Regions:
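Helix C-cap/helix->beta junction micro-motif
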Residues: 100, 152-153, 302
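Short beta-strand->loop structural element characteristic of the AMP-binding/adenylate-forming
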Residues: 103-112, 307
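N-terminal "arm"/small-domain region of PLP-dependent enzymes with the aminotransferase-like
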Residues: 1-31, 302, 342
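Conserved coil-to-alpha-helix start sites within the AMP-binding
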Residues: 88-94
Length: 366
C-alpha cells in the first residue's frame, strides 16, 4: 500500500464539481481581485470565526506581518519591543516579528508541544508588549493563565491561527480569543486554497481599517496613501475556492479527529511517544521517537510518507545566526525526535489501520 502524507488531489476530488462551478463563476464574472467572491468569503469567515472583521490578504505570513505593522501605526508597538513566542514554532511566526523590528523572546514548549504557560512570566521584561500565541499542529495553545498574564501585564494577545482552522476554546473559535489573529490558507491547511491566501480577524475597528489599508499598498481610497503598505491581496479565485471548502471544514476536522483517536487507541510501540492533545483539529499528527530517522525510513519502505515539523528550530537557522548559541533543550529535542504521521480527511480506514499496523510491527518484521 502507498500512502501519501497529504494528497491535495484526493482532497480536491471530494468536492470537485462544486469547486469547478465556483471557479467558473469567477471566470465568467470578469472580476478577479477585490470583488464579490472576496467580500462574500470575508463576511462568511468573520461569521464563522466570530469576529466583526475579516481582512483577506496574500498569505499567512503577510497576515501576521500586517497585524504587527498596524499595531505600530496605532502606537501600541514600537521598534525594539519584545514579543513572547513559542521557541518551536514555524519560522513564519518569527519572521513577522523581525520584519517589524520587534524582538522575539523564545519560550520553551510544554508536553503538548505548545507554549509553556508556566514559563511565560519569567520571560517578561519591561519591554514586553505582546504574546504571539501559536496553535501549533492544530492544537489549542490558549489557557486561562495566558488571559490573566495579559491582563496583569497589559499585553496584547495575537494568535497565529495558521494551523488551527475550526479549533475552539471555551466555545469560541481560535482566531477570536485574542486581540487579533492571522490565518493561513496555504493548500495543505485544514482550510486550504489552491494557491497562497491569508486573512486577519479582529474585533478592533481601528486595527481592521489600518490592516486593510496596509494590505493594499497603504491606501484607504484610490490613489491616496496614508501608510507605506504592501501588495497583499487574496484573489477572487482563491476566495471562491475557500468559500466552497469552508462549508466542509467542521466535517473534515471530525474525520481528522477520528483518525487521531484511532492512532491514540491503537499505536503501541515502546519507542514511540504519543502526544494526545485534549483539544485539537490535528492539522498535523506528531509523534516523538528517539530513533525518528530509522522509523521514518522504515515507514517509507512500507510505502508510508511522513514529514518532520520542524527539523531545524528558528534559533538554529542561519538567518538568525545571533541566536545560534541559545540553549533551548526542549525545543531541540522535539526537532530531533518529531515525526508527523498522515492524518487528513481523504484517508481511508484501511490506510489508517495500515499505518497503525506498520508502526506496531516495526522491528518485529525485520
Amino acid at each position: 500500500m502507498k500512502i501519501e502524507y497529504l494528497s491535495l488531489q484526493r482532497i480536491t476530488q471530494q468536492h470537485a464539481d462544486e469547486l469547478h462551478k465556483a471557479v467558473q463563476r469567477v471566470i465568467d464574472s470578469g472580476w478577479y481581485l477585490q470583488g464579490k467572491a472576496t467580500n462574500d468569503f470575508e463576511t462568511a469567515y468573520a461569521q464563522y470565526i466570530g469576529t466583526q472583521h475579516c481582512i483577506s490578504c496574500g498569505n499567512g505570513l503577510d497576515a501576521l506581518t500586517l497585524i504587527f505593522r498596524a499595531y505600530k501605526q496605532l502606537g501600541k508597538l514600537h521598534e525594539g519591543d519584545e514579543v513572547i513566542v513559542p521557541a518551536n514554532t514555524y519560522i513564519a511566526s518569527i519572521l513577522a516579528l523581525t520584519e517589524n523590528r520587534l524582538k522575539p523572546v523564545l519560550v520553551e514548549p510544554d508536553m503538548l508541544l505548545q507554549l509553556d504557560v508556566t514559563r511565560i512570566e519569567a520571560a517578561i521584561t519591561p519591554k514586553t508588549r505582546a504574546i504571539l500565541l501559536v496553535h501549533l499542529y492544530g492544537t489549542c495553545a490558549m489557557h486561562t493563565i495566558i488571559s490573566a498574564i495579559c491582563k496583569r501585564h497589559n499585553l496584547l494577545l495575537v494568535e497565529d491561527n495558521a494551523q488551527g482552522h475550526g479549533l475552539k476554546w471555551h466555545e469560541k473559535h481560535t482566531g477570536s480569543i485574542g486581540d487579533a489573529a492571522a490565518h493561513s490558507f496555504y493548500p495543505g491547511k485544514n482550510l486550504g486554497a489552491m494557491g497562497d491566501a491569508g486573512a486577519v480577524t479582529t474585533d478592533n475597528n481601528q486595527l481592521a481599517t489600518i490592516v486593510r489599508s496596509l494590505a493594499n499598498y497603504g491606501s484607504n481610497r484610490k490613489y491616496v496613501f496614508p501608510y507605506q503598505g504592501l501588495n497583499s491581496r487574496m484573489d477572487e479565485l482563491q476566495a471562491a475556492i475557500l468559500m466552497t471548502k469552508l462549508t466542509y471544514l467542521d466535517h473534515d476536522n471530525q474525520r481528522r479527529r477520528y483518525i487521531a483517536k484511532r492512532y491514540e487507541e491503537a499505536i503501541r510501540h515502546e519507542a514511540v511517544t504519543l502526544i494526545k492533545p485534549r483539544n485539537s483539529v490535528f492539522h498535523i499528527y506528531p509523534i516523538l521517537c528517539k530513533r525518528r530517522d530509522e522509523l521514518q525510513q522504515y515507514l517509507a519502505s512500507k510505502g508510508i510518507e511522513t514529514l518532520i515539523h520542524y527539523p531545524i528550530p528558528p534559533h538554529k537557522q542561519a538567518c538568525y545566526a545571533a541566536w545560534n548559541s541559545l540553549q533551548l533543550p526542549i525545543t531541540e529535542r522535539i526537532a530531533a525526535t518529531e515525526l508527523s504521521l498522515p492524518c487528513n480527511q481523504a484517508m481511508t480506514d484501511d490506510e489508517v489501520e495500515y499505518v497503525i499496523h506498520s508502526i506496531n510491527t516495526w522491528e518485529k518484521t525485520i
